[in-house]
Amino acid sequence: MKRLLLLFCALILTGGLYAQDIRALIANAGDSNDYPSAGKITIFDTTLVDVQETGLSYVHIHKLDKILTAKGALDLSVIKYGYDPLSAYVDIKMVKVHHSDGRTTDFDVTQVIDYPAPARAIYWGAREKMLEIGRLYPGDAVEVVFFKKGYTYALLAGEEDDERYIPPMRGHYYDIVEFFSNEPVLEKCYEVIIPSSKELQYEFYNGEVRSSVKFREDTKIYSFTKKDIMPMKRESGMVAWSDVAPKLLLSTSPDWYAKSRWFYGVNEDFGSFESTPEIDAKVNEILKDAKDEMDSIAKLTHWCADEIRYSGISMGEGEGYTLHTGEMTFTDRCGVCKDKAGMLITMLRAAGFKSYAAMTMAGSRIDYIPADQFNHSITVVQLHNGEYMILDPTWVPFVRELWSSREQQQNYLMGLPEGADLMETPISPPENHYLYINGNSEIKNNGTLTGTFTIEAEGQSDAAVRGVFTYAPIATWHDNLEKELLKVSPNAILKEVTHTKNSDYQNTPVKMTYTYEIPNYAMVTEDEVIFTPFVAKGVYQRAMGHLYTNTSYEERVYPFRTGCSLLLEMNEEVKLPKYKEVVYLPEAEAVSGKGADYSGSYEVSKRILTFNQKVTIKKRIFQPEDWSSFKTAVNNQRYMMEEPVILAR
């Protein structure tokens, strides 16, 4: 009874305070003159969380938005909320429009539509609740009250009542609260009532918040409030907003070791990695020609990567942290990241390895408060020397790596029986992702260019080059090879191309040799010869992700990222037509920094012009201070792509 009274009082404090004078709040909130770049503003956004001993949370949300423009009116014309019915319950309790002329309209929430959410590749039965408000006008305000219970990530669905909404790590509570928005927020308040028996740790990142803790007989009340939250200006290629914008992390889990042991135990108890005679037979078949420990791990990883299609179908019980059984995935030959990871663990164990599941966050940083900041499941194998190695069958289909270097500098947590701390994947050296392009060509007196060039690549560069095969039907391969030539010069004629066998990707890095002819490539007149060497113009830019970076910024405010570290070396010898003197050779200053290195040059000896260029992209995630060297390297390569050589005749 005391707890219900306390909750009622807290609701009065958080929501009822605003209800006393909604009209005044709307009138004093400002308009489009005060916020010229915003379509709407949030006047208040309050969340009250009531945490039970089981970890189950009851969440009450009260929000008021004011429309400033027609775009803002369109955005608020429909109220929509997504949820996973296996782990969360959502109820839209109240929707009211406060019109600019003083009228109010209360909407019938029994008319809320509950329907399957649109989905692609992962079909886990997610749903959305929606209520159409209709046409609104600047000056109107929309007030909404939500109630929800449950948690964000699904595990094992319970049988009845609220059991299914209790978090996976029973008895524990966590939350990740964003205190940033793409529209102005005048006040955001987050309050959590938690049993006194639970120890809650929290940290506010990337900013400041007003906080307080109140102690009652059997509960503690934590409050966090931030006012005047303004949209932050996005930078092209920056890291995730959650890495740099204000956010609050809360968790009752003591540390990552506890989370690690729990993750290990929940999958072992479920029997996720038990093998079958059919799986054992397949493992023996895959490993019949394996040469050593690493070859065995590679063969099993690539089988799970290549042969298990990425497609998630809801199996009901078991979605989320619990990995489906190896038997199920082996039968279905499809699944999402956790299924591919679980299949690999099952096969590795069948082969005699010690292997476990792990979790990571693709796309953003995991901070040290042990809240569940995960969106991706991976595999860990213990080598014979005792070291742990991480594997990712989801990200390496037809890629020569076992752990994708597009995930370097990424946090992960291994689920081990002894527990583990949060870790980070190291930087992958650029030379592991080399891209070598070497050419020989000749410019005829009529301006026709004839020549050959060879591309060799490894790691993620190999995967990018090999994409002309991997992501297309075999009938289109020749056309795709030709398109890479035509991107440089639409007049190009592909005479011949040879390449390594794509299906042999595990054994041999990709290598391609083109023979081509390009009529009217160079401008050749009685007075001069003007051209840019073919290799310098950037053939196979599909493997040069750094060239797609927006380099218009003088400085960076936030960390930024590219696809992967890279070592690019481009060389070409061009046989020239007769000429008298060199009028102009492009020059780009060498640079060496924490972000990137660059060197490039031209040399002419008699009738042979030699072009050399080397670009080193040193990592995937960069700090603002790395921007200068990275930007210079990119701009220098672009300059060499566009600036011509000029010879006098």
PLM feature segments, named:
Residues 20-649:
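A sensor for short, sequence-defined functional sites
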Residues 13-14, 403:
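Single-residue recognition of alpha-helix boundary sites
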Residues 4-13, 344:
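Sec-dependent N-terminal signal peptides
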Residues 15-19:
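Sec/Tat signal peptide C-region and signal peptidase I cleavage site
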